[in-house]
Amino acid sequence: VWLLPEMADSLGGRMEVLELWPLAQCEIAARPRSIVDELFAGDFADRYPFDRDDFIERLTAGGYPEALERRSGRRRQAWFDSYLATILQRDVRDLAQIEGLTELPRLLQLLAARSGGLLNMAELSRSTGLAQTTLRRYMGLLEVLFLIRQVPAWSSNLGKRLQKSPKLFLSDYGLMAH
């Protein structure tokens, strides 16, 4: 529907847009509460008997159902390779007139390394060699493709909140580890 804007326009009031995020660990494990909820409830240790290797495996597997279906790390890597190639080549070409298709994979790698940190456009511009206006356009496109998310700064003071830098996250921890 999004690729045919005239169709989306004609469905006004008859469609709903849902953002589907990768699965959370509680969804993957079919648990009613999240790990954070159980940690605060004080019953974390008894319910999650996994060790460091299990934890790393869970993180690198991510939350995309298709990636989770692949049991071996090699097959998951192949899925992530294919997923990123499809999005960064075909979908980008369909959505925008971008001349720097070759720059997007490297930009995504740099953003993955900075995931969870404050977004510093000047430093990112120096690291990539891209102008800040180009970076903003590319990052907007990566957000539309649900690969990254910018989380606004938080402060109880509205003025400070508007001045602070947002944090940047990749949409999936398996994608970030890839």
List where the protein language model places each region.
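Conserved nucleotide-binding/hydrolysis micro-motifs of P-loop NTPases
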Residues: 1-3, 22-27, 155, 175
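Sensor-1/coupling segment of RecA-like P-loop NTPase cores
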Residues: 1-7, 142
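Short, exposed beta-strand "edge-strand" segments with a Pro/Gly-rich flavor and a Y/T-containing core
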Residues: 2, 17-23, 164-171
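Interdomain motor-coupling "hinge/lid" segment immediately C-terminal to the ATP-binding subdomain
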Residues: 5-113, 117
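Accessory nucleic acid-recognition modules appended to NTPase machines
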Residues: 68-178
